[in-house]
Amino acid sequence: MIEGVRDIEESTLRTVQGLLRTLMEKGVVNALLVPMTLPSDSVAPMLVTDAAALEQADPLAPVLPINGARAASQLTMTSHKEKLGMVLRSCEIRALVELVKFQQVKLDNALIIGIDCLGTYPVTGWQAAGSKQQVVDGLLVGAVTGELQPFDGMEFRAACQMCEQPLPEGDHVALTIGLVGVETGQVYLKARDDVAQALGLTANGTPAARAAAAETLISARSQARDAAFAEYRERVHSMDSLLQEFSTCIRCHNCMTNCPICYCRECIFRTPTFEHESQLFYQWAERKGTVRMLPDTLLFHLTRLNHMVTSCVGCGMCTDVCPVDISVGTVFRAVGERAQVLFDYHPGRSLEEAAPVQEFREDE
């Protein structure tokens, strides 16, 4: 890997767009998965094959409408001749790594481009933001020291407030675009040799302030995480309190649908198993006196926890899409933390490290 800084030309966004355009023009990739600004002024991940269209690319936009690993799965799971570059945040990369292990993503003809995440806002909050450029500029200023604060009147997504892994990590990342701990007017790049050569990157090292700024950011996020987990564990400590936590669940399955790890088409909740015959409801009511409609809400969440909590990367998409504002992501992260410690497993850390559900250990 080659590391160095590059002076910004015109703006940080234009510089990043230029880097991506160079990768396409030099043939390192001939397609890109990248967030782009839409005519509605919202942002969505787009598949780009025309380098000129990168004028609308906006990987700096602090919004995460979906976890990009879901899109990457659709673009790579079956054979394709195009060389694909995927511009992703850290939580998306970690989800991608997990999906590689479950054979839902293939990296044979793809490379990962990671960008420092300075925090994201809910989709509706970003859409309603007045001066989007001021919001982004404020984050870039805070990134220099790692002291990131939301824009006045706005609030980071709950998952971002307690994300202790905001920077891309791992040798599987072919290009890192660094913003944290980088002087105003520069951008930090860490690239695989062939990518560095295409970009004309000179090896001049890591910015001196990057490690300290990253530590400042991670420390603040870790404190917020620990406080959120402590509050959850104080509130949920028994079966009754767990039932209360999910008492407003309407079993819409939004959390499952938008979770990058819940890919399984054979999931029991996608089958007729829980499409009970009408008479059964009356029999249950006769036995219990009352039956909740729709039933099996807690079973749904417990099944998801059992199946994927060791691979939960904390992206928070489940919380974002819950129509009744259940903090699903906090539940899964708090439970997942203990399960992951138990198996000494860090989801998304390594492509070579098998997920706990993929292997059997006699001492587990």
Language model segments and positions:
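Short amphipathic alpha-helical segments
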Residues: 98-100, 175-176, 261, 271, ...
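Local cysteine-cluster metal-coordination motifs and their immediate loop/turn environment
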Residues: 89-94, 155-168, 247-268, 309-325
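Ferredoxin-type iron-sulfur electron-transfer modules in oxidoreductases and energy-metabolism complexes
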Residues: 224-247, 264-364
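Alpha-helix boundary/capping residues
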Residues: 100-103, 249, 338
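A general structural signal for well-ordered secondary-structure junctions
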Residues: 29-30, 106, 255, 318, ...
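Generic structural signal for well-ordered, non-membrane alpha-helical segments
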Residues: 9-16, 252, 315, 328
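Residue-level marker for well-ordered alpha-helical positions
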Residues: 17-18, 243, 253, 306
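Iron-sulfur-associated redox domains of electron-transfer enzymes in respiratory
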Residues: 1-242
